[in-house]
Amino acid sequence: MLMQITNNVNLDIEHAPKWFKDAIKLQPTDEVLENPLGNISYSKWDSINNSENLMIFVHGTGAHKKWWDPIAPQFLENSNVIAVDLPGMGESEFRDKYGIKDFGDCIASIIEKEKLNSNVKNVYIIGHSLGGQVAGYVASEKQDLIDNIIIIDTFIRPPNYNPAEHQGGPLRMIKHYPDKITILNRFR
C-alpha cells in the first residue's frame, strides 16, 4: 500500500506500524541547557526502570531532535534517552560560529548536567551523519564522559586528510516543489 501524503499528520500515519504510533504518543520533557553562546534545546524521556544508562541521539546537518521521536522510546526499558537540537538547528539558539568542537562541547555539557542531576552512570551517544562526527569528537576529546558511541552514515576522514587538497563537487540549485506529493514522488 502506498503511503498517501496529506496536510494532516494523523491521516499520513494512518497505516504506520503500531510501534511507530505508540512511540510518537510518548511525549518527552523539553529541556534547555543555558549557555552564554546560545541555549541548547533537547528532549528527554525517562527510563521506565530507573536505569543508570543514558543514550543521547544527535541528528545530522539541517535536522532536529524531533527526527528521533519514533526511535528514542524504543530504548526506555533500559535507558534514559535524550535527543538534542544542535546549535542553530531545531529549537536551539543560533551562534556566531559553528564547528564540530562547538557541537561536541554542547553534548559534553548536557552529559555533565545529566550526571550531576540524576543517577546516570553509563553514557552512549548515537550520531547520524554530522551527529556521528560530533559523537566522534566527544569520544576522542572527552573520553571520561562517555562509554560508547554508535555512528550512522558518517564519513570518517583518514589521518592524513588535508582539507586544502579537498575538492568538492559543484554546488546544486535548491529545488522547490509545489506540494508534498511531488516531493514524495521524487524519491520513488
Regions from the PLM with identified roles:
Residues G127, G131, A135:
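Gly/Ala-rich beta-loop-alpha elbow adjacent to hydrolase catalytic centers
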Residues D69, A108, G136-S140:
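Short, hydrophobic alpha-helix immediately C-terminal to the catalytic nucleophile
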Residues N35-G38, S43-W45, A83-I126:
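Active-site loop/oxyanion-hole signature of alpha/beta-hydrolase fold enzymes
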Residues M1-M55, L76-S79, L116-N119:
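Alpha/beta-hydrolase fold catalytic core
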Residues W45-E91:
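Conserved HGGG/HGGXW glycine-rich cap/lid loop of the alpha/beta-hydrolase fold
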Residues W67-D69, S92-Y98, N160-P163:
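Conserved catalytic-core motifs of eukaryotic protein kinase domains, centered on the activation segment
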Residues G136-S140, N148-I181:
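Flexible "cap/lid" loop of the alpha/beta hydrolase fold
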Residues L54, N80, N122-Y124, D147-N148:
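Structural signature of beta-strand start/N-cap positions in the alpha/beta core
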